[in-house]
């Protein structure tokens, strides 16, 4: 983007040289031409930012919909067979440990 020539302070503090019939017309015209260029640059920047803002809003909306769709899908639960197999293995281990512990106590 083009750089900005005048700040608001520069415009406020601008003083023109006077000639025989008032201000120097050429100097005033150059200054106003530069002010117009600045306004055109500002308008272009504003339009670009508006377009970017709209694109970001759309992306946010799409991301929000994607997340909500993902959250609504049911999480697959472990199958009951796998759970019962795990429980069965745990019971077998407990049974072996009890035999080891209580079996030794009976012998003593």
Swiss-Prot record:
GO terms for biological process: cell division; regulation of cell shape. Keywords: Cell cycle, Cell division, Cell shape, Coiled coil, Cytoplasm. Its main location: cytoplasm. It comes from the Bacteria. Disulfide bonds: none annotated. It is found in: Cytoplasm. It holds the Pfam family DivIVA. InterPro entries: Cell_cycle_GpsB, DivIVA_domain, DivIVA_fam. Residues 32-69 form a coiled coil. GO terms for cellular component: cytoplasm. Forms polymers through the coiled coil domains. Interacts with PBP1, MreC and EzrA. Divisome component that associates with the complex late in its assembly, after the Z-ring is formed, and is dependent on DivIC and PBP2B for its recruitment to the divisome. Together with EzrA, is a key component of the system that regulates PBP1 localization during cell cycle progression. Its main role could be the removal of PBP1 from the cell pole after pole maturation is completed. Also contributes to the recruitment of PBP1 to the division complex. Not essential for septum formation. Belongs to the GpsB family. This is Cell cycle protein GpsB. It comes from Streptococcus pyogenes serotype M1. The gene is gpsB.
